[in-house]
Amino acid sequence: MNPLIFTTIVLTIIMGTMIVMTSSHWLTVWIGFEMNMLAVIPILMKNYNPRSMEASTKYFLTQATASMLLMLAIIINLLYSGQWSITKPLNQTASIIMTLAMAMKLGLSPFHFWVPEVTQGIQLSSGLILLTWQKLAPMSILYQIFPTINLNLMLLMSVLSVAIGGWGGLNQTQLRKIMAYSSIAHMGWMTAIMAYNPTMTLLNLVIYILLTTTTFMMFMLNSSTTTLSLSHTWNKAPLLTMTILTIMLSMGGLPPLSGFLPKWMIIQEMVKNDNIITPTIMAVTALLNLYFYMRLTYSTSLTMFPSTNNMKMKWQLNNTKSTAHVSPLIILSTLALPLSPILMLLE
């Protein structure tokens, strides 16, 4: 892709998200979403092949449907209140439709079907953008409308997302699909706490982006897309193998790693609000996530697949890819739990 065109597209993606996050008018929110969606499609099609075209088409159709629902919610709210302002409380019907639109954009269950398919059809770098940056705009809208969100609807979608995120990843060998199902589960945790404590949702979002970015960086360093290709990491970089092991367990939410922190705080907050059944179900289904991450860890780091003698010598070759940015990401994505007393003061 031409560097000038690529820079323009990236700036448009950033601008679209910023317009959504800073706007106080519903029409400009919709415009921001459209800018973001139309600019991200060329990024998804960067590696031009039938698979990426299919993924881009699925993404476009899903996001266009969500934008249509968003506009419907805005018009219904305008009819009832006569207001375009985002700061005014939403009408109940408009709030439900808007919640469904944002759930579709985030990939929450039962609108999750596009996430694994789209992520599998694109490059790792495009998948990183899709599963991190593209979550910011819908999450900021949910954050702003949280006082009018229907609690039962949100909790139902959250529990379903955590369950499907766990079940879906169990039989996968493709790393991008595993990350997609993990993203669905993480979105479920974030939206579950939205109606109780939206600040905690932001904390969870930051940790999720940190963990996902680090994991994708590791995959990109090794050019790994399947469990088998990841299992050959020990040939190229033995130290990196140990790091991947730790990050995988952190993604699964195993204490005392960083990934455990948001789950712990969310369960604690929901119990404080006399909601015990929901966090119990979510904690049990989250074990499915931990299981497939532990299985991935086992096959990557604790077993040695049959390989030729030439394969065993790969560690002697110099790695031409820069790894300077990976070290701080690894530290933050594994060792952030001691920050929990400070973070609990932010509630």
Curated annotation (Swiss-Prot):
GO terms for biological process: mitochondrial electron transport, NADH to ubiquinone; mitochondrial respiratory chain complex I assembly. Its main location: mitochondrion. Pfam families: NADH_dehy_S2_C, Proton_antipo_M. It catalyses: a ubiquinone + NADH + 5 H(+)(in) = a ubiquinol + NAD(+) + 4 H(+)(out). Its EC number is 7.1.1.2. One of its GO terms (molecular function) is NADH dehydrogenase (ubiquinone) activity. GO terms for cellular component: mitochondrial inner membrane. It is found in: Mitochondrion inner membrane. It is a multi-pass membrane protein. Keywords: Electron transport, Membrane, Mitochondrion, Mitochondrion inner membrane, NAD, Respiratory chain, Translocase, Transmembrane, Transmembrane helix, Transport, Ubiquinone. The chain crosses the membrane at residues 1-21, 25-45, 59-79, 96-116, 122-142, 145-165, 178-198, 201-221, 237-257, 276-296, 326-346. It is an enzyme of class 7 (translocase). Core subunit of respiratory chain NADH dehydrogenase (Complex I) which is composed of 45 different subunits. Interacts with TMEM242. Belongs to the complex I subunit 2 family. This is NADH-ubiquinone oxidoreductase chain 2. It comes from Boneia bidens.
